Amino acid sequence: MVKPKYKGRSTINPSKASTNPDRVQGAGGQNMRDRATIRRLNMYRQKERRNSRGKIIKPLQYQSTVASGTVARVEPNIKWFGNTRVIKQSSLQKFQEEMDTVMKDPYKVVMKQSKLPMSLLHDRIRPHNLKVHILDTESFETTFGPKSQRKRPNLFASDMQSLIENAEMSTESYDQGKDRDLVTEDTGVRNEAQEEIYKKGQSKRIWGELYKVIDSSDVVVQVLDARDPMGTRSPHIETYLKKEKPWKHLIFVLNKCDLVPTWATKRWVAVLSQDYPTLAFHASLTNPFGKGAFIQLLRQFGKLHTDKKQISVGFIGYPNVGKSSVINTLRSKKVCNVAPIAGETKVWQYITLMRRIFLIDCPGVVYPSEDSETDIVLKGVVQVEKIKSPEDHIGAVLERAKPEYISKTYKIDSWENAEDFLEKLAFRTGKLLKGGEPDLQTVGKMVLNDWQRGRIPFFVKPPNAEPLVAPQLLPSSSLEVVPEAAQNNPGEEVTETAGEGSESIIKEETEENSHCDANTEMQQILTRVRQNFGKINVVPQFSGDDLVPVEVSDLEEELESFSDEEEEEQEQQRDDAEESSSEPEEENVGNDTKAVIKALDEKIAKYQKFLDKAKAKKFSAVRISKGLSEKIFAKPEEQRKTLEEDVDDRAPSKKGKKRKAQREEEQEHSNKAPRALTSKERRRAVRQQRPKKVGVRYYETHNVKNRNRNKKKTNDSEGQKHKRKKFRQKQ
């Protein structure tokens, strides 16, 4: 029998392996490997063919075909003979120091990090060395002395003074209650597990949403509550972004600044600006604050990332701080669901702000901390309706808020404790149970709701917020000791005073110096804040220590900003006037003086209005309701108008003559030939004359169902009647 010939690749391979491109498609044969993918995978797996002697018969596709022993040609280039890339130790040290300062400055951005030797900077920062035994890894002989192998020892203190300071700081920050390494006796007492409602914002799902937002955003905005900015910060997220995502920009937005005095907002912005760029913001669709500055900042970030088609801005923070409200304010309409309770936003949401800027809303996230249940409730993390015993947290509310504010809000003069306060409030509001007993639970929920929604005036004072204390006089005993010593020993210098008195004097002087240094530092920080906080409408009525008078520097800054805005508006008006004006210059010569006088009067009125506002802010401890103020200021104006009318009726005075002369001049100007209208004005007049309703002209000329019996006769209607008469005559 003859052996059949080899037919080659014309036959179909019947195997069902995944490497066979001709295999039969099964039930799930939609996502099978195609022929190109199979060839690529075979290329990865294949081996060169060798004979029995080990010589390559068939090389791989990517292997060189040059025979062994041939001399390869090197490309002629001058770089082979030039110096290699080297750097001096001094210049490297200078680069590291300058880069450190730039990286720590929150208002500076390194544009092209790929072209800089960033590894030289990052290699020095080794936080994991804290837990490593340095003597085991690097002995003293290899680090110091003639046999040292390191140019720079790996130490966390440069000298003894810094080492002592580090030790003192660690001892001051040590808390025995938080030390888990201490051996304690087991007394059998166990802390009760927290309820699930106090763990809101800590679930795995919400943290997954947070990491989704962080990964997909170029700029991360952390929204803080202006009443307690440090309490609503998330240090864990900040350290995570600094270590794991250093290329992402983090900024702070201080929301709800309408619930805090303006001086406190300004100081908090100055304090937080040392870490990250900070903006004060008031989320409102009708009367927002900081919206223009925020959008301008986002545009600057968009210009930084010119290589990207668009940038995404993620909003993160504690629950109920106003993340969704900030997004609605930026869009000027409701695009996110908002509510004064925590947990309204469930999942992340993409919103388009502009063509190149997208906003991402994120649910509120809480990092597990050692806050008590009361702290968690007062931060607004928990919904008040779900708290089983709200009356337990009222004591903290009464401690944090001033008694005068609480008595003003609830019209209760005095109380002994939290329970007494709730009972009085229940009787006053009528929240009673059967038998006339006060409903403490309902009243407690009312108070907590008022606290979370800002109806009770409260805010955490910024650091160094205490006013300057006048230097106190020295005690009389210490002052009297000095002359006695001088009389007894006139030839010797007085070096000692009464023991305790001298120590107290030195302590007071050091305290005053430190206080002055802190105040000077705060003043330097405050000068960097550029926002005009005078435009914030503060809702709560503060008094006493919470009201700080407006400083002269603040007034000057606000006046400068006001004058800058006025100049910008005037420049815009000039540009518009130059573009729109088409009149000859000869006609405008007479009106120039009047226009200048009018502009100056308007400017004076605006400055007067601004100064009145500043005075009102300075003496804002005395507040008058809006209706009462309108009545008070309306009466003098009416009296002034009536007096002017009486004067005009009695006799023509000098002022009356001037008014008559002005009226005559105006009549003369009006009698002159009217100026030619521009095309824009003519089109506007035509549009105003046109009827806005559809079909109005039809009813004017036609009688439809006797709607218009007194119809106007037109040429068309007369022609139609004439035709009808002719037709009847023919018949």
UniProtKB/Swiss-Prot annotation:
Region spans: Disordered: 1-33, 481-502, 555-594, 630-731
GO CC entries: membrane; nucleolus; nucleus
GO MF entries: GTP binding; GTPase activity; RNA binding
Main location (coarse class): nucleus
Entries under PROSITE patterns matching the protein: G_CP
Modified sites of kind Phosphoserine: S504
Effect of substituting D258A: Loss of GTP-binding. Punctate pattern throughout the nucleus, including nucleoli
Biological process annotations from GO: ribosome biogenesis
Outcome reported for the amino acid change (mutating P475A): No effect on nucleolar localization
Segments of skewed composition (Polar residues): 10-22
Binding annotation for GTP: G317, Y318, P319, N320, V321, G322, K323, S324, D361, C362, P363, G364, V365
Description of how the protein assembles with itself and partners: Interacts with LYAR and RPL23A. Interacts with the nuclear importin-beta receptor and, at a lower extent, with importin-alpha.
Similarity section: Belongs to the TRAFAC class YlqF/YawG GTPase family. NOG2 subfamily.
Protein name as it appears in the record: Nucleolar GTP-binding protein 2
Organism the protein comes from: Homo sapiens
Lineage start: Eukaryota, Metazoa, Chordata, Craniata, Vertebrata
Recorded name of the encoding gene: GNL2
